[in-house]
């Protein structure tokens, strides 16, 4: 539900299956429950409307031709009475899918395969209306520099070898394109 959560993973075809298999295995180990219990990884969504949006996203990705790899769903029973606990889902998708272009604040991860050079991944990454946070995982310094360059990631936050979530304390925080309304914190907070 964080605005900086990873929702699209753009993976090179040479490692796609390996990454996909590792993610599917990891998701099967997630514990869902009371967020105050340190043994749990995932808490509830904010309200039942968020649950409806989550369910609609899963239905939409399938309707558009995507493939569910880790089945989602709403949990019920003891400890889940609120109706707001859902299973994190993974779906294979295309960046052109309408649902992938839409920001869903729920645990749905879209896997998108790319081929060729890192520029192709950057083009896919930049091919949405949102632009808050991005990250690249690479051992190649040139790819990292390309991602961080003026013609690379068009997000307000661009990270290398760390996730998309989080922000630097005291650093400017904000996005590009349809994301956010300017910068919060940092030196931008003093500007009028």
What is each PLM-predicted segment?
Residues 13-130:
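NAD(P)-dependent aldehyde/semialdehyde dehydrogenase
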